[in-house]
Amino acid sequence: MPSSRIRFLALFLLFLPIQSEAQTKGVVNFGRLKNLEFIDQFYNGGTGSLGSGPGPNFGLQFTANAQTIISASKGGSGNFINNPGGNPVMFFQTGNPVTMTATNGVGIAVWFYYSALQTGSATVYAGPNATGSILASVTLPPNNSGCNTYKLCVWSAVAVPLSATAGSISFAGVPDSLAIGPVHLGSAIPTSMVLTSSQNPSVQGEAVTFTATVTATGTAPVGSVTFKAAGHVIGVVPVSGGVASITLSSLKKGSTTINAKFQGTVFTTVGKSLVQVVN
């Protein structure tokens, strides 16, 4: 092989981009795991302690005390009902927190559902196995009331936006008093919006306020709303307290379509529209 070609290949190989492993993205819903089964290697492409699996290879490692339990209403031994998705949920029977380590890290956000009889917490760490700096810590207050046959019947959503890559998340609480439902890793936090007009129809020259009310799963939305009238941008307004509004008095007679689109770094984009009638 000519020396010039060898040099070319060497340079080509030298500057090949390094392929990094993709960050973890998926839903840990505990489906296919059995009643009182330890999660073990199920979400690392392996099996649970009772042989369930192989599960999806999310590169997740769980501490040895992480178990799943099925509702008694479905033939298991769990004292709960109404869990989102109807799959088994995660719990622990020892005083140590349950920690889930993501080998490839998690970006964007973590959001999950929980049910608690006593106060618990969720702490997100930069490193594996609950090490490194704390990126976020959320209190999980008791949320069950009005339950009859089952002690746990209310499930609350909690979302944690991430400004840096997370290495692990730890769930702590009183044993047998905290249950964790589906855990969403690395995906944008779902949002919804309602767009309203202060006066519709209105009179030409009358000030009309358009209000976009934005809600997000398990947390307050952070971002801005872009308002358009007849396809033209009329303002970009930051969301405060879940609300962004803009006031116009210059709309022409007739019907004008008003559009509002919410955008946030770790939130899903959502848009709504209405037709404003001016007499």
Question: Where are the language model's segments positioned?
Answer:
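Surface-exposed, well-ordered secondary-structure segments
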Residues: 23-188
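Solvent-exposed beta-strand/loop surfaces, strongest in extracytoplasmic domains of secreted
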Residues: 188-279
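Bacterial N-terminal signal peptides that target proteins for export
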Residues: 1-8
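Sec/Tat signal peptide C-region and signal peptidase I cleavage site
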Residues: 18-22
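A generic structural signal for beta-strand entry/edge sites
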Residues: 17, 97, 155, 166-168, ...
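Bacterial N-terminal signal peptides
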Residues: 10-17
